[in-house]
Amino acid sequence: MQWREMGVVMGTRPYGDEHLLLSILTRNRGLRRGLTRFTKKRPLQIGDLIDATWRAKLPTNLGHFTCEVIASAFYSYFRDRIKLMCLSSITHIMSTALPENEPHPTLYDSFQDFAAAAEAEAPWYNHYLKLELLVLSQLGFALDLSKCAVSNSKDNLLFISPKTGRALSEAVGCAYRDKLLPLPKVLRSISCGVETECCSADEFALSLRILGFFLRRHLLQESHTFQESRKILTGLLG
């Protein structure tokens, strides 16, 4: 049994003295795991784009990867702590939450858009927020930010219900604002597929707090790593 495909490194961890357990995201096969030999010469890092060949006797076996790095992520992220933490966050989210062997080509393409913007030193906040929104929607927990859940109005949408993930207008939600989440304009625009200019650091931080709430609630309840890293990340942004 063998296949070959481009993939992005989602994570590695030691497996014995000479191997790593490697997690990669591919466009056509989704999240895949397998063993690969550890090398000090050019160690694999999260975000690396690799040409991966997987081999096993049976499809259900863990299997082994032979990898060639096509593009290293290190130089695009290591000088920017916020960018590096976002890369670490999204790879952790996807390697933890995505089911194995289930293709998510839209999610893969969105990751590549984020990586391209980050590596080109272009505005990338919106690309990252789109990624987290897609993780929720692809796994069945989409936020509905297109209209008010009560009145169906598309105007003055200022809140999100923490219970339903649906938008609420100012008129409907004002009396309950202490129990609701704020709705940043950038999240609504991205969710509705509307092109918008890159958000500010403050709006990015607010959006991360909101998406973090829903990711933690639906997909990462037991991930203390995610909770701690999200606190640090939003703290750095202000």
Swiss-Prot record:
> What are the GO cellular component annotations?
bacterial nucleoid
Name the Gene3D superfamilies for this protein: Recombination protein O, C-terminal domain
Q: Which keywords, in A-to-Z order, does the entry hold?
A: DNA damage, DNA recombination, DNA repair
Q: Which domain of life is it from?
A: Bacteria
Q: Which GO terms describe its biological process?
A: DNA recombination; double-strand break repair
What is the documented function of this protein? Involved in DNA repair and RecF pathway recombination.
Q: Which family does the similarity line name? A: Belongs to the RecO family.
- The protein depicted here goes by the name DNA repair protein RecO
